[in-house]
Amino acid sequence: MVKKTLLTILCCILFPLCINALEGSEKLLFEKNSLYQYISVVEDSAKKERYIRNNKRDLRQGGIYLEAPDKLLFEYSRMAFVSLAFLERDPTMVLFVGLGAGSMPKYFNKYYPDAVTDIVEIDPDMVFVAKKYFNFKENEKMKIYVNDGRLFIKRTPKKYDIVFLDAYQNDYIPFHLTTFEFLKEVRSRLKEDGVVVSNILSEYNNKFFDSMVVTYRKAFPNVYVFQGQESRNFIFVATMSGKMKVQESVMADARKIQKFRRMDIDLAGIGESCEYSTAYERKTAKILTDDFAPVNLYKYQKSEAR
C-alpha cells in the first residue's frame, strides 16, 4: 500500500496533469511530457482563446484568438515588433529562436511576405502542437529547423536583419542562451545594422534581470528596454549600430511602419515605453558567461542595492 502511494505521488510530480487546474470554461485539447518540457493545449470557450500552458496554470507560452487567429494574443509578442523601428530599411532575413504556438513568425510573414523567415525550435513536439492546434503552416519563405538555437546560430552561414530570441520558458531558462558568449555568436550572424530582440519574463528587481541587462550591454553598442503594461515581460532591443536612438525617433519610425504596413498593433504606443538600458543597470550585477550563468537561481533572488 505504501509503495503504491509513493508511486502515485512520484507520477504526479514527474507527469503533472493540467486538467486538475482547468476552469469551467476551459477544455484540455492536448498534453504531453516531451523530452524538453511539459506541454498542454487549452481552449477557453468563454474568452474564445486557445493557448499553450505548462503545469503552472497562470503561465502561458503562446496562443491565439479563436475568432481572429492572425492577431497577437499576448502583450510581449506585440511588443517585440517595435524592433522594426530600429532597422533603417525593410528586413529581408529574420530568425526566430523558439516557435511556441508560431504566432510571432506567422504574424511577421503576413506583413513581410517577401522576407525569409527562419525558425529554430529544439522540441519536435512543439512543432507538432503549433501545426495541429494553432494552424501554423510553413511556406516557401517561412521554414522551421528542429535544432538547438545556439547550435543553429553557430553553424548557419546566413546573416540576419533581426533575430528574435523567445526560447526562455516560464519555469526554466536555458542558460546557454543567456550568456555573453552566446550573444557574441548572435552578433556574428547579424548584418552590419542588425537588431536582436529578446523576450525577458522577469521581475524588475531580481538578479536575473540585472545580469541580463549588463550582459547585453557588454555584447552590443546600444540596448533599449521596453516594459510591459499588462504583464511582467520586458523586451530588450539590442542594436549593432553605435548611434543611439531617442524615444521620439523610435515612436516616429514605429508609427510610419504601422501605417505603411497597416499593422493592427500600436507600435508607436509601444515605442513610448522605450528606455535606454542604463536606467536599469546595477553596478553589482554579474555578467553571464558560459562558465557562470546561475540564471534559474538568480530569478528567485532579489536585486542588490544600487
PLM feature spans:
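A generic structural signal for short, solvent-exposed coil/turn residues
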Residues: 13, 33, 44, 109-111, ...
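Acidic/histidine-rich helix-loop elements
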Residues: 56-70, 172
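Soluble small-group transferase modules, centered on the S-adenosyl donor enzyme superfamily
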Residues: 22-51, 55-60, 222-306
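Positively charged n-region of N-terminal signal peptides that target proteins for export
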Residues: 1-4
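The AdoMet/dcAdoMet-binding core of the Class I SAM-like
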Residues: 45-46, 71-198, 204-207, 213
